[in-house]
């Protein structure tokens, strides 16, 4: 990002979407039950895991304690995490961990302004 003084500072954006997100519990055409949430996460994971044979993939799950933290919903997340942990070559982490990893593996190299 170019700053007002003309210098350049790194700016990393970790993808976030409403696809695998508990906000869909409060949207029309969203999740009605924890089972719907679990099945959607599992199907998404299975597709990405298969695609990951060729190149790394990332699955971001948006969670909000006021939504997913309900007694009838939190079990679906626990079941999903158990399912994912049964697979090899999977890293379960927080968004900040993804950002730190990206910055370490792909350090910022400023490009020439106007190039």
Language model regions located:
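C-terminal domain-boundary segment and adjacent tail
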Residues: 35-115
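Active-site-adjacent pocket scaffolds in enzyme catalytic domains
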Residues: 1-55
């Amino acid at each position: 990002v170019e700053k007002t003084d003309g210098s350049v500072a790194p700016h990393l954006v970790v993808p976030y979407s409403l696809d695998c997100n508990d906000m869909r519990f409060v949207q029309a055409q969203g999740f009605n039950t924890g089972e719907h949430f679990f099945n959607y996460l599992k199907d998404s994971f299975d597709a990405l895991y298969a695609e990951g044979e060729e190149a790394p993939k990332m699955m971001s799950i948006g969670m909000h304690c006021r939504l997913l933290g309900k007694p009838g919903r939190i079990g679906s997340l626990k079941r999903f995490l158990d399912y994912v942990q049964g697979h090899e070559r999977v890293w379960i982490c927080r968004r900040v961990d993804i950002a730190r990893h990206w910055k370490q593996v792909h350090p910022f190299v400023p490009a020439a302004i106007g190039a």
